[in-house]
Amino acid sequence: MGKNLLQQRAGKGSPTFRNPGWLRIGKVRYPNIFGHFIGKVIDIVHNPGMNAPVALVKLENGTKFLMQAIQGLVVNQKIEFGKGSPIANGNVIEIGDAPEGTIVCNVEENFGDGGKYARSAGSYAVVVGKSGDRVLIRLPSDKIKAVSNKARATVGIVAGGGVIEKPLLKAGANYWKYKVKAKKWPIVRGVAMNVVDHPHGGGLHQSVSRPSTVSRNAPPGRKVGHIAARRTGRKEGK
């Protein structure tokens, strides 16, 4: 009898595969408040599972929240939050107030969603234009995205951009990188397994040696490969 596949073991819901959300220090997002406030950076901390450092900010009305730390941000720095804030590094502004060419990060799509775009370490977006009640921004992928002019964004570049410059040097470092993100690593190919471990395993060769397409209604132990694929392989020219 064959052994369970990786997705079958993960689907069981054991602690090995469960998301370690209890490690996180909190949600990194803007608070849903209106108006203009002066805030102060209380601390800059590490949030497990994130490469970018996180800044703990306290506003003058007593509200505390976590936001992406910006390059150049320091503890005890004063920042401004909300509509009417000047275009200065670390300030949270309404993106409709930003002129073209402004570098921003942690951009909301609509007011109140907490921030959706350019949130990872070293990333930023650029305001490239305005159209009615929408603001056009260029994302790190070079795609142009239209967001609400009431959406909030932080002026500057997310800190921690050099995280990919340091080499991992050994497999153990990569293991712990994925471990804190609750991702499976390393990924073993099915054709490299024994026949008891995977439908593509066995045979003393590194090939599937059978059709890799599988029905959408296949049972879990057989549902691997190209699931419900219309076609496989390279598309031939006309």
From Swiss-Prot:
Start and end residues of each stretch annotated as Disordered: 201-238
Keywords carried by this UniProt record: Ribonucleoprotein, Ribosomal protein, RNA-binding, rRNA-binding
GO molecular function per UniProt: RNA binding; rRNA binding; structural constituent of ribosome
Positions with biased composition (Basic residues): 223-238
Extent of Polar residues compositional bias: 206-216
KW rRNA-binding (keyword) present: yes
Alphabetical GO biological process terms: cytoplasmic translation
Cited function: One of the primary rRNA binding proteins. Required for association of the 30S and 50S subunits to form the 70S ribosome, for tRNA binding and peptide bond formation. It has been suggested to have peptidyltransferase activity; this is somewhat controversial. Makes several contacts with the 16S rRNA in the 70S ribosome.
Complex and partners: Part of the 50S ribosomal subunit. Forms a bridge to the 30S subunit in the 70S ribosome.
The family this protein is said to belong to: Belongs to the universal ribosomal protein uL2 family.
Annotated protein name in UniProt: Large ribosomal subunit protein uL2
Organism: Saccharolobus solfataricus (strain ATCC 35092 / DSM 1617 / JCM 11322 / P2) (Sulfolobus solfataricus)
Highest classification ranks of the organism: Archaea, Thermoproteota, Thermoprotei, Sulfolobales, Sulfolobaceae
